[in-house]
Amino acid sequence: MFLNVLLLFLMGCQSAGTRSDPIPWANGIEILRSQSQVRVPAIALLRSGWLEQAVCTPETRTHESVFAILAAPSELHAALLVVGGVPGAPGAPASLDSPARPPEGSLLHITMDLDGSVHRLQDLIVDDRSGDSLQGNFVFAGSKMVEWNGAIRYLADDEGSAVGLVTFGDELVGYSEPRSASIEHARAIFRPNGLLLPPPGTEVVLIFTVCPEDEG
């Protein structure tokens, strides 16, 4: 899997030198290098209930996410590299022997585009503690490479963790506030904003923009 990501990255760099924006990518992804932007086709999921993910992949965490992207997280990872994103590391919730650790990596501005109507991802999710939209940020954490049955795998591809809210430690993109995924340690606080989200099954485009360092 690491080799696949590297090949996609190198192909993207080569394409960027010879082609103008947008650059077609795997599974409908489009890259706009001039805008440090990656556009990914997605399907709307929940408009009610509780969330642990913001964005997953089909047939993974669709019961706890507002969108499913129609591409592998490793493909999005490679595309973010092409537009200048720098992966860091997923966060970790607090434990008995260590404090919480927020995710690290390039700051990302994520929006949903539905036929020209654009909303920030933070505004599509409600923090139940305040009743308002999310106040934190999303960062390019980069998930993890793990060995399984003798093969190296990209963990977010297996788990479907494209954009996390609670902290599983496998997220491609993490939310800036580390929070335990266990309800025994932290109550559920994230829920969909049904006033802004489209009906389940609606086709949308998610836009990932790498922010300049001085915005971090």
Question: What spans do the regions from the language model cover?
Answer:
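Sec-dependent signal peptide recognition
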Residues: 1-8
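Long, low-hydrophobicity ectodomains and other hydrophilic envelope-associated domains
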Residues: 19-216
